[in-house]
């Protein structure tokens, strides 16, 4: 937590609520003085605000800002754009195919975008396949349209979350700001009607991981919670606290600028817009532990000084300074008047600047006036120097001053105005460069016969084609008829054999080979006897 209520309490002024941190305490109510014995001296308990009377301590758990919490809460997300890619093919009469690609957009659904994103981060091959344009189909003399509805995912797309109202701020969302992401509204509209922004996690509440649960002791009075001792042992008062939500968690902003979520706290007063929460980072956490150690050490120093006083039976102005209450509230003040130890009831207030208590030289402002001194002695070790200047033993602590400067530079801004109107795209072409393609199922539509000609030319071409086809049919029919006629008038090979003629001995025609053979044999037979004769 930032600077604890160890240094604050119920009666801090409004300036303290707005980020002013004290480094010294001085009585705003003092007196009357009464003599006391040296044995009545006591060291104040700076870890408890005594005037609240919250003495009953009970262990309990509470939520506070996690150490290391930074002002800018980054929420990783992605953009989802609906795109319809259309491939139109036309095949003309001679088979020439013309393909035209067109793109238009549509507003995607939340569930489809979530599924597409899961595909992408899981490395599903279907997502890689969907990156291509639709494969165009074609039919002769027809126009074919092939379309794909694509969900284009861009990731990461980081937005800043405002811890106060869980609104998201990004340059791409509408007006640079988006209301809280919830189950009823799981997306943010963007500057483009067809694009939505969604968180990477389906449960965006985990993005606001800035809280941690700590153990402490709640301080009650008559059963009423009025403060608590935090995990580091420092008391924090609930006086002056106001209700404030961080990341949707209801809690209390304490007067020191810290934030806690306590159970069973009824406070109807809400914080004003200028009451912000201090950051709890590693540096402030380290200093906080040093502050707690310093307070413990100062109490030990006070006890050592008190032991020395009681042992030596003597007291000095410097030792009286150890008895000053470091926490605003009721306590004791001590001084020495005419060598007599004096005590007075006092109510301490916080001091931010030295000029608050030393407005001019020689004036120590306490109780609303320049407090009178007694022989140059004021109280709590404060004296008047030889030159008339006020001398305070405790100069401002360098450690506390370092803590103050750290806290003043570590206030969470209420808004993160990252919206830049100049980044709004004027047309669709400018938006194409920030999308990746995811393509689901394909739809095809096949038109009727389309020659790509005007109406009269199309019918004229059909008529000419019909006449040409008829003429071609007639020519083919005539050719076929002539071919058949020629084939029918040509003799066969058997008939040609039978018509072969031979010449006989008497030079007469021989009708056949058999007749020729018979004729030749007869001649041979007739000539044989004569030869013998």
Swiss-Prot record:
Where is there biased composition of kind Polar residues?
A: 523-533
Q: Which organism is it from?
A: Duvenhage virus
Q: Which family does it belong to?
A: Belongs to the lyssavirus glycoprotein family.
Name recorded for this polypeptide: Glycoprotein
Q: Which residues lie on this side of the membrane: Virion surface?
A: 20-459
Lipid-substituted positions (S-palmitoyl cysteine): 480
Give any extra note attached to this record. Answer: Arg-352 is highly involved in rabies virus pathogenicity. Its mutation dramatically attenuates the virus.
On subunit structure and binding partners, the annotation says: Homotrimer. Interacts with matrix protein.
Q: What does this protein do?
A: Attaches the virus to host cellular receptor, inducing endocytosis of the virion. In the endosome, the acidic pH induces conformational changes in the glycoprotein trimer, which trigger fusion between virus and cell membrane.
The places in or outside the cell where this protein is found are: Virion membrane
The keyword Lyase appears for this protein: no
Answer yes or no on keyword ATP-binding: no
List the InterPro entries. PH_Rhabdo_glycop, Rhabdo_glycop_CD, Rhabdo_glycop_FD
Provide the Gene Ontology terms for cellular component.
membrane; viral envelope; virion membrane
Q: Give the membrane topology, semicolon-separated if more than one.
A: Single-pass type I membrane protein
Q: Which UniProt keywords apply?
A: Glycoprotein, Lipoprotein, Membrane, Palmitate, Signal, Transmembrane, Transmembrane helix, Viral envelope protein, Virion
Q: Gene name, please?
A: G
Which residue stretches belong to region Disordered? 492-533
Membrane-crossing ranges are 460-480
């Amino acid at each position: 937590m930032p600077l604890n209520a160890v240094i604050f309490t119920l009666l801090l002024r409004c300036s303290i609520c707005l980020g002013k941190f004290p480094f010294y305490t001085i009585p705003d109510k003092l007196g009357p003085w009464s003599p006391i014995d040296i044995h009545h001296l006591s060291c104040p308990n700076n870890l408890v605000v005594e005037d609240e009377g919250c003495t009953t301590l009970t262990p309990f758990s509470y939520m506070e800002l996690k150490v290391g919490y930074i002002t800018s809460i980054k929420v990783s997300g992605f953009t989802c754009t609906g795109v319809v890619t259309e491939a139109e093919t036309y095949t003309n009469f001679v088979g020439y195919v013309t393909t035209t690609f067109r793109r238009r957009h549509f507003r995607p659904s939340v569930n489809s975008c979530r599924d597409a994103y899961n595909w992408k981060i899981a490395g599903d091959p279907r997502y890689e396949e969907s990156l291509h344009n639709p494969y165009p189909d074609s039919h002769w003399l027809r126009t074919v349209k092939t379309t794909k509805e694509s969900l284009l995912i861009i990731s990461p797309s980081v937005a800043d979350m405002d811890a106060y109202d869980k609104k998201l701020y990004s340059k791409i969302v509408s007006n640079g700001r988006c209301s809280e992401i919830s189950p009823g509204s799981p997306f943010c509209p963007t500057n483009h009607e067809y694009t939505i922004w969604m968180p990477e996690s389906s449960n965006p509440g985990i993005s606001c991981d800035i809280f941690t649960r700590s153990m402490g002791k709640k301080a009650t009075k008559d059963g009423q919670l009025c403060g608590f001792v935090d995990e580091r042992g420092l008391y924090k008062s609930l006086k002056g606290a106001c209700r404030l939500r961080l990341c949707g968690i209801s809690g209390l902003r304490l007067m020191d600028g810290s934030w806690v979520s306590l159970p069973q706290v009824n406070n109807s007063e809400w914080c004003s817009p200028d009451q912000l929460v201090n950051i709890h980072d590693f540096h402030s956490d380290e200093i906080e532990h040093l502050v707690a150690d310093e307070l413990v050490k100062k109490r030990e120093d006070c006890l050592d000084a008190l032991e020395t006083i009681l042992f030596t039976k003597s007291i000095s102005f410097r030792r009286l300074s150890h008895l000053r209450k470091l926490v605003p509230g009721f306590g004791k003040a001590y001084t020495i008047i005419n060598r007599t130890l004096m005590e007075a009831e006092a109510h301490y207030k916080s001091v931010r600047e030295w000029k608050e208590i030393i407005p001019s030289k020689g004036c120590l402002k306490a109780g609303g006036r320049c407090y009178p001194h007694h022989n140059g002695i004021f109280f709590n070790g404060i004296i008047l120097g030889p030159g008339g200047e006020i001398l305070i033993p405790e100069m401002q602590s360098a450690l506390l001053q370092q803590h103050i400067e750290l806290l003043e530079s570590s206030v969470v801004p209420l808004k993160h105005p990252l919206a830049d109107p100049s980044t709004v795209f004027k047309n669709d072409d400018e938006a194409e460069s920030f999308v990746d393609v995811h393509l689901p199922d394909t739809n095809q539509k096949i038109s009727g016969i389309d020659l790509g000609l005007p109406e009269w030319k199309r019918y004229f071409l059909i008529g000419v084609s019909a006449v040409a086809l008829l003429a071609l049919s007639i020519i083919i029919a005539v050719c076929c008829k002539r071919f058949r006629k020629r084939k029918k008038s040509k003799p066969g090979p058997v008939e040609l054999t039978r018509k072969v003629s031979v010449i006989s001995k008497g030079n007469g025609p021989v009708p056949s080979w058999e007749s020729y053979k018979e004729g030749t044999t007869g001649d041979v037979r007739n000539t044989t006897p004569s030869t013998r004769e």
